[in-house]
């Protein structure tokens, strides 16, 4: 050819080999070491050929051959793209686009198919790409004699990067040999075509045919091999001179070469060149086909094996689930056949199978050896880790695991069958022998017969089992992919069986949506060294006859090895099982992307573990510090978890996110706080109505549950017993002006109204000890000042309504927050002391009225005649059941009855001890839990019934009975009626007393306010998980207003009873059955409804008709219940416990916060101050000023806020005055509702 071809522009065709004339004689080649380093740095093969200048390639020989990697990279990159001939049309026939500027994103190529093949580029897309490239090609592709590195511009798409990265990890597949002549040429233009071919060969310095193969051998690259059935390919066909780079923008786009060369060629030659250079030849566009070889299914960068890796499906993000872990060991059965036997399981704590009895032991915290954890970490670091394995059956998983073990050189190829056989052995469980129905385990020996059950393919074989794992043919892989796309078949009816009782019981304890971890460890002698595999399945699947219960399996851990290895397989199995049951580790296992994530999670677990020294422990008390240290470690771990979210791959939250989260939490807390003040009159009351009344209809629908019926029966007796007890004592204190009938009617009426209108229907309103103390004090005040007691209560009721409206209007319920544990414990301790004192005071009074008689001879003349006459005259009148003296209302109480004092003592003590013992029996170990709870909850009614029967059976001894009228009547009809005249019954009530009644009204309001609001606070604790909310203002207004109105009818005012309300809430609490053995019970829901309280109030009101039965109850039995309430109220009072510490050496002090964080003398000082306040209250109660005791009690609030804060530090006050009481739902010995509240009964 006359004119020498011009050098191609570097930016236009980066893959053209430069002319040898442009290379210096001494230009060195690219060093092999630097090339390897650049491979590792850039991560893309042949990437340096794009980056380096043309002159730097002089080290390569001009005639070197190009392998299949060159072709693949050349085709898949954006540097050289063949376009169909239809794209080379005049500009007016094509839609032109703006050039690709730096501000525009490059057009994204279609992603590769899942099989790794490159999709065909559509013609329309090429038109757009060609038009966009044509605008910017003028400035970038102008031929220049010298090119600089800054002129190199290339674009590497994301798909290119992924494809090249996949190719880098796999060996290059054989490529076809180039034919001698690949492109058909017309005979008419053979000479011109040969000239063009020679010019191109001179420009690129590459010989075709055999010359390329020789040069290729010299360059050190393997000779490409032609694949059968594919057209051979020659690099010469992809070459064109540099002037053709911008041919699309030429004025004559149909001319395939430069102007000078085109003038020397005939038209046929030009057409041939057009066909060769512009057309999309199918043979050239054909994609490479390689021999199929299954790649490693291992996720992440760890342990990737060479081989073509098809592009996997994107992994769906794993959401951590609750976990169930089962440890199986390879042991011999009674027939000396190996099998997998379950030896332990973890739901939260470890449960081991006792070897001798084959029973499950008690749940306990797993204690691990430090060496086993180190061995586990080492095995995970060197073993096989397969993440997101896409298998549905145990045989498929086993084959993948075994092949991965062979690939990672853990086992020999000849051990493949033995390991596989070991993995597919049958599994046995301790519960199998208890089931006499269809056998649960299906033998895996006949594996072929199970394939149809697993896949529903009839007689077809399982590809996972019958085909080799590596090197399979493409057809098998396609069949497997089609099979995975099919929905999982339903279990065949032939092997379906009903779950056993043991399985159902265990499934109740496993959390919902839990996923299982199977741990398989054992000794096999055919292996020379241990082998390990950790598998996480892509989707959790149920593996037949593997687990004890049908729970889907997500993780598998396998450890096999010889007994000669210095490794305890059982301990390593326990270690990985304990790790998987740990919340932080199994969350990290779900989110792990590679092996390093698991190793990091193990290190985090070790950071929070406690190592005990190898010393002998003499007692459990020596291990108390271990539990304390462990709690500190867990607290630190939780704090770190809040700063850095757990799980692999998660970034820490930014400061903005933390601030936003705190604002949201603060806003939510402020919105849900019912004590927050609005600043408007009655604003809190309006918020209570808007919060609670929208749930009004659901309050009745939610009562349609059997548990509510059981709660009605239980709470009825729990409410009736105090009503009878306090009613009898109130009648004693007020000379029957207010007695049992008035208290029962008041409880019924106010209970019905409150359950219909109240904001928190779980509250049980009733009479309490503080109100009883006030009623006694006010009655004494009225008697000493010759005032009518019932009329004075009416005016107190009027002032109560006014005070309630004023408090609610000012949103004063927030003041309950200032009533701390310091005041509550003094109040509760005072009432308990009053209960205990009143019991023994009444008993002593009985002994004074009915003294004991000494034994004397019948003929003695020194016997007191008066007393004998009383005893002799009374004895004949006693009828069966000593009932004849019960109704002597007009004759007064009999005195000096024989054996009355002793029988009263027996009845009182018997009632107390029976009720107290049944309360303890509730949390004992006898009988099933349900029976114990029923007996314990009805302990007080059972004690009353037993002692009433004892009294009834003793016919000749008098005891004072409960005074209850017949029918619907007041206790003393001769003294009062149902309606009280506010102006006076027998004489006009003084006007000054109408106004002065404000003071006792304030005192009563203080008592009702404290009891009601503190009880509502206890019920509304967040640990109880109430959903409908409470209403402090609405409940206070209803209770106080109803008490004020009931005073017009001579009925006692009531308050929220703390113990009964907590008992009511506990009875309506549904505990979750999915509680791990050894774990605390968790609340599932609370039946928040109005029906149970409504029915209880109605039943208490109807109890007035059983007056005949109530009249059989001796007062001594009520004294026993009074003593029981006083003693049990002391439980849970920290003040009472600290009083014990005054008499106890410091070495015997309990391990509690206020002992460990506060010095002993400072703690005793705090106790002494509380004791001083208690003594002051008791002194006030013992004087004529006993009516003012609520005012003295409320003064302890400013005392704590002003005085104690100057004596004690904030840290000491938090330890001594913190409200640490939590709801009690479990069955710990000696712990019940009384331990939860420092409030009086």
From Swiss-Prot:
The modification N6-methyllysine is found at residue 274. PROSITE patterns: ANION_EXCHANGER_1, ANION_EXCHANGER_2. PANTHER family: ANION EXCHANGE PROTEIN (PTHR11453), ANION EXCHANGE PROTEIN 2 (PTHR11453:SF14). Residues 708-1241 are annotated as: Membrane (anion exchange). Residues 210-219 have a biased composition (Gly residues). Belongs to the anion exchanger (TC 2.A.31) family. Residues 141-155, 189-209 have a biased composition (Low complexity). The modification Phosphothreonine is found at residues 183, 257. Residues 37-49, 58-75 have a biased composition (Basic and acidic residues). Residues 120-133 have a biased composition (Acidic residues). GO terms for molecular function: chloride:bicarbonate antiporter activity; enzyme binding; monoatomic anion transmembrane transporter activity; solute:inorganic anion antiporter activity. It is linked to Osteopetrosis, autosomal recessive 9: A form of osteopetrosis, a rare genetic disease characterized by abnormally dense bone, due to defective resorption of immature bone. Osteopetrosis occurs in two forms: a severe autosomal recessive form occurring in utero, infancy, or childhood, and a benign autosomal dominant form occurring in adolescence or adulthood. Recessive osteopetrosis commonly manifests in early infancy with macrocephaly, feeding difficulties, evolving blindness and deafness, bone marrow failure, severe anemia, and hepatosplenomegaly. It catalyses: hydrogencarbonate(in) + chloride(out) = hydrogencarbonate(out) + chloride(in). It comes from the Eukaryota. Residues 848-900 are extracellular. Sodium-independent anion exchanger which mediates the electroneutral exchange of chloride for bicarbonate ions across the cell membrane. Plays an important role in osteoclast differentiation and function. Regulates bone resorption and calpain-dependent actin cytoskeleton organization in osteoclasts via anion exchange-dependent control of pH. Essential for intracellular pH regulation in CD8(+) T-cells upon CD3 stimulation, modulating CD8(+) T-cell responses. Residues 1-240, 288-320, 449-471 are annotated as: Disordered. This is Anion exchange protein 2. Glycans are attached at residues 859, 868, 882.
């Amino acid at each position: 050819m006359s004119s020498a071809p011009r050098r191609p522009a570097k930016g236009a065709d980066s893959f053209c080999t430069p002319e040898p004339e442009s290379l210096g004689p001494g230009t060195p080649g690219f060093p092999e070491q630097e090339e390897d380093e650049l491979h590792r740095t850039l991560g893309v093969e042949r990437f340096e050929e794009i980056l380096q200048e043309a002159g730097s390639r002089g080290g390569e020989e001009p005639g070197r051959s190009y392998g299949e990697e060159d072709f693949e990279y050349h085709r898949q990159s954006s540097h050289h793209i063949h376009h169909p001939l239809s794209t080379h049309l005049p500009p007016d026939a094509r839609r032109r686009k703006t050039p690709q500027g730096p501000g525009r994103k490059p057009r994204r190529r279609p992603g590769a198919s899942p099989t790794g093949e490159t999709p065909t580029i559509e013609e329309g897309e090429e038109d757009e790409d060609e038009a966009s490239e044509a605008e910017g090609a003028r400035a970038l592709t102008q031929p220049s004699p010298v090119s600089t590195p800054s002129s190199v511009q290339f674009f590497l798409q994301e798909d290119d990067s992924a494809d090249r990265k996949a190719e880098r990890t796999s060996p290059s597949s054989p490529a076809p040999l180039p034919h001698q002549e690949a492109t058909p040429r017309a005979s008419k233009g053979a000479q011109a075509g040969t000239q063009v071919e020679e010019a191109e060969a001179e420009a690129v310095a590459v010989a075709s045919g055999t010359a390329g193969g020789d040069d290729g051998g010299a360059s050190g690259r393997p000779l490409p091999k032609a694949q059968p059935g594919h057209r051979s390919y020659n690099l010469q066909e992809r070459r064109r001179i540099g002037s053709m780079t911008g041919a699309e923008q030429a004025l004559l786009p149909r001319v395939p070469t430069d102007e000078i060369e085109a003038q020397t060629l005939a038209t046929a030659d030009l057409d041939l060149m057009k066909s060769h250079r512009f057309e999309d030849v199918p043979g050239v566009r054909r994609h490479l086909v390689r021999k199929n070889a299954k790649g490693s299914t291992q996720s992440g960068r760890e342990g990737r094996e060479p081989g073509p890796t098809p592009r996997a499906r994107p992994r769906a993000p794993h959401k951590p689930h609750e976990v169930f872990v089962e440890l199986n060991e390879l042991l011999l059965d009674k027939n000396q056949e190996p099998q997998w036997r379950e030896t332990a399981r973890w739901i939260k704590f470890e449960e081991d199978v006792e070897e001798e009895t084959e029973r499950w032991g008690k749940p306990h915290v797993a204690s691990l050896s430090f060496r086993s954890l180190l061995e586990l970490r080492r095995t995970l670091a060197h073993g096989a880790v397969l993440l997101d394995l896409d298998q549905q059956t145990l045989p498929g998983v086993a084959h993948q695991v075994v092949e991965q073990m062979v690939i990672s050189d853990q086992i020999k190829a000849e051990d493949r069958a033995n390991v596989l056989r070991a993995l597919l052995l049958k599994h046995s469980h301790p519960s199998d022998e208890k089931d006499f129905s269809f056998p649960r385990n299906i033998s895996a020996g006949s594996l072929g017969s199970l394939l149809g059950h697993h896949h529903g393919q009839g007689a077809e074989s399982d590809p996972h089992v019958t085909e080799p794992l590596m090197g399979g043919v493409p057809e098998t892989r396609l069949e497997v992919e089609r099979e995975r796309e099919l929905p999982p078949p339903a279990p065949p009816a032939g092997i379906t069986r009903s779950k056993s009782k043991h399985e159902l019981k265990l499934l109740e304890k496993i959390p919902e949506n839990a996923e299982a971890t199977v741990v398989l460890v054992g000794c096999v002698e055919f292996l020379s060294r241990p082998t390990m595999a950790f598998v996480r399945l892509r989707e959790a699947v149920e593996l037949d006859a593997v687990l004890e219960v049908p729970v889907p399996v997500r993780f598998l851990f396998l450890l096999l090895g010889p007994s000669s290895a210095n490794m305890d397989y059982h301990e390593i199995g326990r270690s990985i099982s304990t790790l998987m049951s740990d919340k932080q580790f199994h969350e990290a296992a779900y989110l792990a992307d590679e092996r390093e994530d698991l190793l990091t999670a193990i290190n985090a677990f070790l950071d929070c573990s406690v190592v005990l020294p190898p010393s002998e422990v003499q007692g459990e008390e020596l291990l108390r510090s271990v539990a304390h240290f462990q709690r500190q470690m867990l607290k630190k771990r939780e704090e770190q978890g809040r700063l850095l979210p757990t799980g692999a791959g998660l970034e820490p939250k930014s400061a903005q996110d933390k601030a936003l989260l705190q604002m949201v939490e603060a806003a939510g807390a402020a919105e849900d706080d019912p004590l927050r003040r609005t600043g408007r009159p009655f604003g809190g009351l309006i918020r209570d109505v808007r919060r609670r009344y929208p749930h009004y209809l659901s309050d009745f629908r939610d009562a349609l549950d059997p548990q509510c019926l059981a709660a009605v029966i239980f709470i009825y007796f729990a409410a009736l017993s105090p009503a009878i007890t306090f009613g009898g004592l109130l009648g004693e204190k007020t000379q029957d002006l207010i007695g049992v009938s008035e208290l029962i009617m008041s409880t019924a009426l106010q209970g019905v109204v409150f359950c219909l209108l109240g904001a928190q229907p779980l509250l049980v309103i009733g009479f309490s000890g503080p109100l009883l103390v006030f009623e006694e004090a006010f009655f004494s005040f009225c008697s000493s000042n010759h005032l009518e007691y019932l009329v004075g209560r009416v005016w107190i009721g009027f002032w109560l309504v006014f005070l309630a409206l004023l408090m609610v209007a000012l949103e004063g319920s927030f003041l309950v927050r200032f009533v701390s544990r310091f005041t509550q414990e003094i109040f509760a301790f005072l009432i308990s002391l009053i209960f205990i004192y009143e019991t023994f005071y009444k008993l002593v009074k009985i002994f004074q009225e009915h003294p004991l008689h000494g034994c004397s001879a019948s003929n003695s003349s020194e016997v007191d005649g008066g007393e004998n006459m009383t005893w002799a005259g009374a004895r004949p009148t006693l009828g069966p059941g000593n009932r004849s003296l019960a109704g002597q209302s007009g004759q007064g109480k009999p005195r000096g009855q024989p054996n009355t004092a002793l029988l009263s003592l027996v009845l009182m003590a018997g009632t107390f001890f029976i009720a107290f013992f049944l309360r303890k029996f509730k949390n004992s170990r006898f009988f099933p839990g349900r029976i114990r709870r029923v007996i314990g909850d009805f302990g007080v009614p059972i004690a009353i019934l037993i002692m009433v029967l004892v009294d009834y059976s003793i016919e000749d001894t008098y005891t004072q009975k409960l005074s209850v009228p017949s029918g619907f009547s007041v206790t003393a009809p001769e003294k009062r009626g149902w309606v009280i005249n506010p102006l006076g019954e027998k004489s006009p009530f003084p006007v000054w007393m109408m106004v002065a009644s404000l003071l006792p009204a304030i005192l009563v309001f203080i008592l009702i306010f404290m009891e009601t609001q503190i009880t509502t606070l206890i019920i509304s604790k967040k640990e109880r998980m109430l959903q409908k909310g409470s209403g402090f203002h609405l409940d206070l207004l209803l209770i106080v207003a109803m008490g004020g109105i009931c005073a017009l009818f001579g009925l006692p005012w009531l308050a929220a009873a703390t113990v009964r309300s907590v008992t009511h809430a506990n009875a309506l609490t549904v505990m979750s059955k999915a509680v791990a053995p050894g774990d605390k019970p968790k609340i599932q829901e609370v039946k928040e409804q109005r029906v149970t309280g409504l029915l209880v109030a109605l039943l208490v009101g109807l109890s007035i008709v059983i007056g005949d039965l109530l009249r059989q109850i001796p007062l001594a039995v009520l004294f026993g219940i009074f003593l029981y309430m006083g003693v049990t109220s002391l439980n849970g009072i920290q003040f009472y416990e600290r009083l014990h510490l005054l008499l106890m050496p410091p070495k015997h002090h309990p391990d509690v916060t206020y002992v460990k964080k506060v010095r002993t003398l400072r703690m005793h000082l705090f106790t002494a101050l509380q004791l001083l306040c208690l003594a002051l209250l008791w002194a006030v109660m013992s004087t004529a000023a006993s009516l003012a005791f609520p005012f003295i009690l409320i003064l302890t609030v400013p005392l704590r806020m002003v005085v104690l804060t100057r004596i004690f530090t904030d840290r000491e006050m938090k330890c001594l005055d913190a409200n640490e009481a939590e709801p009690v739902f479990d069955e710990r010995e000696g712990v019940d509702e009384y331990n939860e509240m420092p409030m009086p009964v």
